[in-house]
Each structure stands twice: as C-alpha cells, then as structure tokens.
C-alpha cells in the first residue's frame, strides 16, 4: 500500500481497526470518502467526534445514552415492575424495534466467556443485584443470546437471583441457536418475548 499517499494509508489503517472491516474493505471505504465532498468527509468526522464525546452508559441500565439516566429509564409510562436483561445495547435496540417489550432494561455489557477471560466480575451483574434491592422489580426477563455463552450467562443469573423474591423468566426459543438478538427480525423477537418461561 506504499503507493498511496501517507494520509490515505493512515485512513485505511484506521478504518481497518473497525470490527468486520478488513484491509480491502477499509481501502474501498477510504476511497469512497475521498471521492465524496469535503463537506461530507467533515460531517462524518464530526459525527464520530460528537458520538465519542456525548454517548455514555446510562447509570441505571448501562445502555448507550446521551443523557443520564437514559430516555427509557426516565419514561414513567413503561412497566416499572419488569426488567429485561440483555448482553449488549444492540440487543436492547433490537427488542425496542420489535415493540413487544414495554418494561425497562439492564445491559450486562457482554456475556460469560471463560475462554475469552470474561467472568461475572467483568459484567454488570453486581449492579443488577443492587438494582433489584433498591427498586420494586417483580420480574427479570433474561434475554441473553442462545449461544453457549448466552445460555451460561442465563443459568448463572438464575443461580445468582434465586431467593431474591423476583420472578425470573427466560425468553422462549424462536431466536435461532447461536444467533444474536441484533440480527433477529421483529416478529421472531415478539414471539420469543410472548413465550418466555421461568428458568
């Protein structure tokens, strides 16, 4: 790639650091940006900077937000008795798009994965337990993925939350085994939520 100007090489290098973006895709993206207007390139750079500066984790649910608490946690019309536990903020967005869940959320920021060095202390499980002590929550809906890690996380949560006096349910199958919630269509997510069961 030494035949490209150093600034273009650097842009390709930075783009290739993004997940799922290899060197060839980064090169195509960089060339596309250069073919566009300076105004479009500046708007892209500004939107990246703005998102990096303003988006943070909500101190209640740990979802992505530009205010604290986030708009979902502040919404008094939502069911305050039910909290849906998800792995990532993208899972929360997928459930919101389905329109099937009207409660609040708790984002773990991952799932248990001993092979990758992710244990309970690396997730927002302690915060969930504290939240259950402070708030009048009647049901926790565990909506982790159906991968081995997602199922392990669900089982761990069941063990940790047993005896808390809170009903613990798991979304039903319907989400494909090994699938991520963010790639599941809205109808499948709605059916999975409607058919949730006790752990």
Swiss-Prot record:
Alphabetized Gene3D superfamilies for the sequence: 3.30.60.80, 3.40.1360.10, 6.10.250.240, RecR Domain 1
Assigned keywords, A-Z: DNA damage, DNA recombination, DNA repair, Metal-binding, Zinc, Zinc-finger
Database matches in PROSITE patterns: RECR, TOPRIM
ZnF C4-type span: 58-73
Signal sequence, start to end: none
Toprim domain boundaries: 81-176
One Pfam family linked to the record: RecR_HhH
Annotated GO MF terms: DNA binding; zinc ion binding
TM helices/strands, residue ranges: none
Keyword Manganese: no
Biological processes annotated in GO: DNA recombination; DNA repair
SMART domains tied to this protein: HhH1, TOPRIM
InterPro entries, alphabetized: DNA_Rcmb_RecR (IPR000093), Hlx-hairpin-Hlx_DNA-bd_motif (IPR003583), Rcmb_RecR (IPR023627), Rcmb_RecR_Znf (IPR015967), TOPRIM_dom (IPR006171), TOPRIM_RecR (IPR034137)
NCBIfam families cross-referenced by the UniProt entry: recR (TIGR00615)
Physiological role: May play a role in DNA repair. It seems to be involved in an RecBC-independent recombinational process of DNA repair. It may act with RecF and RecO.
Family of this protein: Belongs to the RecR family.
Protein name (record): Recombination protein RecR
Organism this protein belongs to: Desulfatibacillum aliphaticivorans
């Amino acid at each position: 790639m030494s035949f490209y100007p150093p600034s273009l090489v650097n842009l390709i290098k930075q783009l290739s650091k993004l997940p799922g973006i290899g060197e060839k895709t980064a090169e195509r993206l960089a060339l596309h940006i250069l073919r566009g207007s300076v105004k479009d390139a500046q708007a892209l750079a500004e939107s990246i900077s703005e998102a990096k500066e303003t988006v943070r984790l909500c101190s209640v649910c740990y979802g992505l937000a530009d205010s604290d608490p986030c708009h979902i946690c502040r919404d008094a019309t939502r069911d305050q008795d039910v909290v849906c536990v998800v792995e990532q903020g993208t899972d929360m967005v997928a459930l919101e798009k389905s329109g099937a869940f009207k409660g609040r959320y708790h984002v773990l920021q991952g799932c248990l994965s001993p092979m990758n060095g992710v244990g309970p202390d690396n997730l927002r499980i302690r915060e969930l337990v504290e939240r259950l002590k402070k708030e009048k929550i009647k049901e926790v809906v565990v909506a982790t993925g159906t991968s081995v890690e997602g199922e392990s996380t669900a089982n761990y949560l069941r063990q940790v939350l047993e005896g808390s006096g809170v009903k613990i349910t798991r979304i039903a199958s319907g989400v494909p085994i090994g699938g991520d919630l963010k790639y599941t269509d809205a109808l499948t997510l709605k059916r999975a939520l409607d058919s949730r069961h006790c752990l």
